[in-house]
Amino acid sequence: MDEFDLIHSITPRTIHHSSVDVGIGDDAALYTAKHGVQEIVCVDTMVEDVHFKLHYSSPEDIGYKALAVNISDIAAMGGIPKFYLVSLAVPSKWTESEIKAMYEGMNELAKLYHMDLIGGDTVSTADKLVVTVTVIGEIEKGQACLRSLAKPNDIVFVTGEIGSSAAGLSLLLEETNPQNSSVETDYFIHRHKRPEPRVSVGRLCSIFKRAALNDVSDGLASELNEIAEASCVSIEIVESMLPIHSDLPKLHPNWKEWALFGGEDFELTGTVSNEEWEVLKQECAALHLPITKIGYVREKTKSKVILKTDQTSMILEKKGYNHFK
């Protein structure tokens, strides 16, 4: 593999943003920032056999998801994703065509959001594939949807469905063997491999006077605990309100673990005032964006998340995916 041939092959033929002054081909990229906006920068790393396995992930799948998880972080701030940079540590067994396919997976998603690839780096490694993606976005000044903005009496919501990605991973790892042949296993696998960042919902939330957001990367319980801690409030959610796919309980009797702690759904969860919830709900319905009320923000007290069932209440611990546990 020739590094310069690879750089030439992945260099975009078109640029979506006129603010890009220098893209791929120099020591660094240059772009002109807009007046009146704040820049958002996020980075995530995916490591072979930690975040994905090659026997069930194609190069395109790996590239797509590596970019998607970063776009989801931009969405959780209420922002617009604009640029991305890619750093790869590639084992020698990988071919140039496989690396190009990984970039194609990223490009497939980038085109949906009119994002420009503006740089990166590629090195060889004797061990596992490592993919690091940095995304740069923007948000109107003062409009970021911070975790610290939840207040008592807010409505708590989540987009889409929760638990589907964890179910998909369990199917891929053959930890789950559905007894019911009617279960849509391909749907759950797709949700794990190809998450859909909720940029449109984040943008809707950014127009409100106040909204707290977090993306469901490590699990709903973990993300809501982060909001509760940052805002110094308690959050109460209702089990019967949680949005799940109708087939999820058919896959495993302990499906609630997937829904609450599974993670990697990359949905958005957050809080808005009661008045703004009505607006958000209507706007999402008009755009066919799934969103569900799941609870309320309670008093400013010791930060905790409570799950209410028909008969009981329990505190949801801040657990989910943790790289160091």
From Swiss-Prot:
Pfam families in the cross-refs: AIRS (PF00586), AIRS_C (PF02769)
UniProt keywords, alphabetically: ATP-binding, Kinase, Magnesium, Metal-binding, Nucleotide-binding, Thiamine biosynthesis, Transferase
SUPFAM superfamilies recorded: PurM C-terminal domain-like, PurM N-terminal domain-like
Binding residues for Mg(2+) 1: 44, 121
Entry keyword annotation includes Nucleus: no
One GO term (biological process): thiamine biosynthetic process
Binding site for ATP: 103, 120-121, 147, 217
Enzyme class, broadest EC rank: transferase
Chain positions recorded as Mg(2+) 5 binding sites: 218
UniProt binding sites for Mg(2+) 3: 27, 73, 215
GO MF annotations in UniProt: ATP binding; magnesium ion binding; thiamine-phosphate kinase activity
Recorded catalytic activity of this chain's protein: thiamine phosphate + ATP = thiamine diphosphate + ADP
Residues where Mg(2+) 2 binds: 44, 73
Note: Reaction mechanism of ThiL seems to utilize a direct, inline transfer of the gamma-phosphate of ATP to TMP rather than a phosphorylated enzyme intermediate.
HAMAP family per UniProt: TMP_kinase
NCBIfam families: thiL
UniProt record similarity statement: Belongs to the thiamine-monophosphate kinase family.
Protein task: Catalyzes the ATP-dependent phosphorylation of thiamine-monophosphate (TMP) to form thiamine-pyrophosphate (TPP), the active form of vitamin B1.
Protein name listed in UniProt: Thiamine-monophosphate kinase
Protein source organism: Bacillus subtilis (strain 168)
